[in-house]
Structure formats: C-alpha cells, structure tokens
Curated annotation (Swiss-Prot):
Keywords: Disulfide bond, Knottin, Plant defense. The presence of a 'disulfide through disulfide knot' structurally defines this protein as a knottin. This is a cyclic peptide. One of its GO terms (biological process) is defense response. Belongs to the cyclotide family. Bracelet subfamily. It holds the Pfam family Cyclotide. This is Cyclotide vodo I1.
Length: 28
C-alpha cells in the first residue's frame, strides 16, 4: 500500500519489492 514513487506501464516495477497497481508502483 505504500507508493514507491514510480509509475508503471507494465506489470513489473524497477524498484525491488514493488508491484504495479493501476499504473503506479506500490509496496504493501
């Protein structure tokens, strides 16, 4: 649930432990 400070166009994020949800990277 914490925003990782990165937008994403695909399912993966460049920041480790973060996942793409609704176009933005979140971690827990």
């Amino acid at each position: 649930g914490v925003f990782c400070g990165e937008a994403c166009a695909q399912a993966s994020c460049s920041i480790a432990g973060c996942e793409c949800i609704a176009g933005l990277c979140y971690k827990n």
